[in-house]
Amino acid sequence: MIQETSERVRVLSVLVEDGSSTLTKVTGMIRRRGFHVRAITVGPSGEPGRSRMTLQIDAGHAEVDQVRKQLERLVEVLEIEDLTEHDVHSRELVVARVAASVVPELVAKGARVLEPGSVSTTIEFAGEGEEVGAFVEDLRRHGNLDVVRSGPVVMRRTARIQ
């Protein structure tokens, strides 16, 4: 289950046909219904010509049913799954430029150096949403120079064989 989200935040996994206007159609439909998209991540799926969207939207359970029905009307949408209450793998990524003096402390917390420097260093950190959120808070305390954070990438866990 995705623990870092509140009751009002739902996580949808949407398989779509690749197309230049697909992202616009999906987000436009959600926006027209008055829902806030907190995060969106899009990338190629394992199937040629198709992409996987992960959407984090502010909506309750009943409202998500409305969103699903509207998304299903779009020709480009092939499959929709609400992953909010499922056992999933969920990862986010943060890339940051920080003062070189704080790098050892951040590396001890799991960060990896991408580009070392004498004054500033570029690092990355990946983890679940709560971990990444806590890491970003640490960066703020250290007076980070620049931060970029991805949206969630979410995949349902496979059944465990015992």
Identify the meaning behind each predicted range.
Residues 1-11, 15, 19-51, 56-162:
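Long, contiguous binding/interaction regions
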